[in-house]
Amino acid sequence: MKRPLIIGVGGPVGAGKTMLIERLTRYLSTKGYSMAAITNDIYTKEDARILLNTSVLPADRIAGVETGGCPHTAIREDASMNFAAIEEMCDKHPDLQLLFLESGGDNLSATFSPDLVDFSIYIIDVAQGEKIPRKGGQGMIKSDLFIINKVDLAPYVGANVEVMKADTLKSRGNKDFFVTNLKTDEGLKSVADWIEKRLQLALLEE
């Protein structure tokens, strides 16, 4: 059995990780892909519960992992709990093509082990401050795709999205990034297309 394409989704608490997965699975479900999602929380399975209530994915395609302690460790140094959750999900669904793995909320420094995920997405929101892209952080710099979410809030928090874009280019060079408002699906298609391009290449290799 070939492993599905695994996309890691990281970012600070409240940036929109769970909503991104909910919106992406809803959009990509219209293309007929076989998908699943695994969420990480420190002491609860709250994000998994949210997906169960909002996602188009059936309940048996959503799993929650309680990492305990530091959420960074569960996606990098000791990812054994997530490897086990992925294996269990793949055993239940041998047809799985795409799996989203959501990290616990962090402080800009979390990165996924390359053994755990094929590609990583890091998402922030403008309410966390215009300076975030300027500050960098390993999660933002090393991710394959960077997303600036909740751009609709920029006028209310005094953030200049154009400045954030310019700072992102300085921090990430020519690596991909998008701006989104997931509440209205603004920018969602760009993110979905980015994923689908990589998924199609992976499927061709089967």
UniProtKB/Swiss-Prot annotation:
One of its GO terms (cellular component) is cytoplasm. CDD domains: UreG. Homodimer. UreD, UreF and UreG form a complex that acts as a GTP-hydrolysis-dependent molecular chaperone, activating the urease apoprotein by helping to assemble the nickel containing metallocenter of UreC. The UreE protein probably delivers the nickel. One of its GO terms (molecular function) is nickel cation binding. This is Urease accessory protein UreG. Keywords: Chaperone, Cytoplasm, GTP-binding, Nickel insertion, Nucleotide-binding. GTP binds at residues 11-18. Pfam families: cobW. The gene is ureG. It is found in: Cytoplasm. Facilitates the functional incorporation of the urease nickel metallocenter. This process requires GTP hydrolysis, probably effectuated by UreG. PANTHER family: UREASE ACCESSORY PROTEIN G. Belongs to the SIMIBI class G3E GTPase family. UreG subfamily. InterPro entries: CobW/HypB/UreG_nucleotide-bd (IPR003495), P-loop_NTPase (IPR027417), UreG (IPR004400). One of its GO terms (biological process) is urea catabolic process. It comes from the Bacteria. It comes from Ureaplasma parvum serovar 3 (strain ATCC 700970).
